[in-house]
Amino acid sequence: MLRIAIQAKGRLNEDTMALLADAGIDVAQSKRKLIARAKGFPIEVLYLRDDDIPQAVHMGVADVGIVGLNEVAERGMAVDEVMRLGFGACRISLAIPREVDYPGLQWFEDRTVATSYPHVLRQFFADKGIHADIHEIAGSVEIAPAVGMADAIFDIVSSGGTLVQNGLREVEEVFYSEAALIARQGLDDDKLADIEKLKFRFNSIVNSRGYKYVLMNIPTALVDQAVQIVPAMRSPTILPLAAEGWCSMHVVIAEDVLWEKVERLKELGAEGILVLNLENMIP
C-alpha cells in the first residue's frame, strides 16, 4: 500500500482532493485525523503542511506526495518528480517599489531582499553573479519594503493583485511552479508499480483538460468535409442514423478552437450539436 502526503488545508488540498475523487479514489476527510485510508485504490493519505511534504517523501514517511514544485525546490530534498498535475500554477518573482527605476538585475547588487524562499533566490543570484542580502521572513513578505525591512521582495505571484495593493511591481520572473506528484527515491518494485497505476489515472484526467466531446448529426454526403474540419485524435466516430442519408459524428475538440470548429460544422450542415465535458481521456 502506498502512503501519499498532501496539503492539510487550503486551495492545494481542495484541488488535490478533487483530483483523487476524479481518479476514483474516495478519501474521508476529517479535521482531527492526520492519516486516512482511501477506497478505490490501495493508498493511505497523510495530511501535512505543504512545506513538510518534500521532507516527508525524502525520509520515507510517505512514498509519494502532491506539492508545489516551489516547495520541492526550496527544501532541496532528493525526490523524483513523477508528473506535473496542471493546477496550483504560480511563479516566484522579484518585485520592487513601483516608483523605482529598474535598469536590470544589477539593481539588486548589495540590496536587501525579503523572501520565504531564500534557497531558490540564493541559487538564482549566485548563477547571475549578484551579491545581495537575503532576509528570510515567514509571511507577509509583500509589506517588507513599505516598513523598511527590505528594498525588494522575492515571492509567489499569481495574478499580481497583491503586489499592486502594496505599491510593488514585478521585474523578474525567476521560477515557475505548479503542483506535481513526487516520489521517494529507491522504492521497491511493488510500490513503483502502484505509482504507475496512480500516474495512469492522473494522466487520464490531466489529458482531458482543455478538451470537449462533441456529438452532432450530419448528412452522410458531408462527412468527408466535416472530417477535414475536425480530424479528432485519430479519426471521428461515424455512426449511421435511422434516418436515411444521415450520420451521427462524435469527436474530441480542443477548447481553444471549439467555437470556431462548431461554427464551421454548423455552416456545413451539422444539426443537433451537443458539447459535453470530458472527465478522463486515455490515449
Say what each PLM segment does.
Residues 42-61:
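Short, structured active-site "lid" loops
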Residues 1-42, 67-80, 84-91, 99-283:
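Small-molecule-sensing regulatory modules
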